[in-house]
Regions:
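N-terminal targeting sequences that direct proteins away from the cytosol to non-cytosolic compartments
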Residues: 1-109, 113-151
Length: 151
């Protein structure tokens, strides 16, 4: 039989958002009351996610395109596909991207939405070396992401 592993989770709540992440992940918060970035790194590998909130409410199209421009500069042979979805109760724009780096396939999920209070930008990345762990890590962060009304 396969190995069963229970993963304890923690909840990040601040800067107008909430999400659940594995307790053994590394988390760093940077920014001020206007703009903040939460960096969550998976403990077992290369997977990471950045969640940025911005009270100046920049256009999600521009945020996604800026991220894509940066990725295209670094990885001109990348493959991308639109990935718009309903996220945290909002229509989110985004892209799913694959590129080769250091002889590995890397995948990046970019999502962004704007509410009356803030713009929320999410970028998660993982490598094929991590198998399903990296993808599952990013998917669980995205699925648990919520915007809070009171901040």
């Amino acid at each position: 039989m396969g190995e069963f592993r229970t993963v304890r989770s923690e909840v990040y709540e601040g800067h107008g958002i909430r999400f659940t992440y594995p307790a053994d992940s590394q988390i760093e918060v940077d920014g001020d009351s206007e703009r903040s970035t939460v960096d969550v790194r998976h403990s077992d590998g290369l997977a990471f996610a950045l969640v940025r909130t911005d009270l100046s409410r920049p256009d999600p199209d521009l945020m996604v395109e800026a991220a894509m421009v940066a990725l295209r500069e670094d990885y001109p042979d990348l493959s991308e596909s639109p990935a718009n979805e309903f996220l945290a109760g909002n229509d989110a724009l985004g892209s799913d991207v694959e590129f080769f780096s250091l002889d590995m396939v890397n995948t990046t999920s970019i999502r962004c939405f704007r509410t009356p209070r803030r713009t929320v930008f999410f970028m998660g990345q993982w490598s094929d070396l991590e198998g399903d762990d990296g993808a599952g890590f990013i998917e669980s962060l995205l699925e648990s992401l919520e915007e809070l009304d009171d901040e």
